[in-house]
């Protein structure tokens, strides 16, 4: 994984970002970006996300993370999915907004989505 990623100005005028119900979901989405692998994927377990992305923000509980993920999936910013009973997520427009140099990136860390999406009740 890269140490950092680009955050382009287009995020400010994104209709999908505007459709998110909370600023918490917007913040979490942007803070995810440097943690994504070369394909725009990361763990989808709310507890892991809490511990990795927002470990020091007490207001961000695992339940709040789960609500934010459901909202991101609802507007089409992420695909939240299962592989072998483990949750992962895929940012849907990652390649459009990142200039990836695959020769310098580490190998894929997270499995590709199959046909199973996660719902907030899962």
Describe the function of each predicted region:
Residues 26, 46, 62-65:
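Generic preference for well-ordered alpha-helical elements
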Residues 1-20, 58-122:
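Winged-helix/helix-turn-helix nucleic-acid-interaction surface
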Residues 31, 52, 68-71:
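Alpha-helical recognition domains of nuclear gene-regulatory proteins
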Residues 4-43:
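Short alpha-helical segments that sit at the start of domains
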Residues 34, 54-55, 74:
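Short, intrinsically disordered, mixed-charge
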Residues 48-62:
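Short helix-coil junctions and helix-kink-helix linkers
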Residues 42-51, 89:
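A short glycine/small-residue-enriched secondary-structure motif
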Residues 27-28, 48, 71, 90:
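Generic detector of isolated residues embedded in canonical secondary-structure elements
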């Amino acid at each position: 994984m890269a140490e950092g990623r680009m955050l382009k100005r287009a995020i400010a005028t994104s209709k999908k970002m505007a459709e998110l119900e909370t600023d918490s979901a917007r913040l979490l989405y942007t803070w995810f970006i440097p943690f994504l692998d070369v394909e725009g994927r990361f763990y989808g377990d709310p507890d892991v996300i809490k511990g990795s992305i927002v470990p020091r923000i007490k207001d961000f509980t695992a339940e709040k993370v789960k609500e934010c993920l459901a909202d991101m999936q609802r507007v089409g910013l992420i695909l939240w999915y299962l592989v072998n009973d483990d949750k992962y997520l895929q940012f849907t427009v990652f390649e459009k907004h990142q200039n990836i140099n695959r020769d310098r990136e580490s190998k894929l860390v997270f499995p590709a989505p199959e046909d199973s999406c996660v719902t907030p009740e899962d």
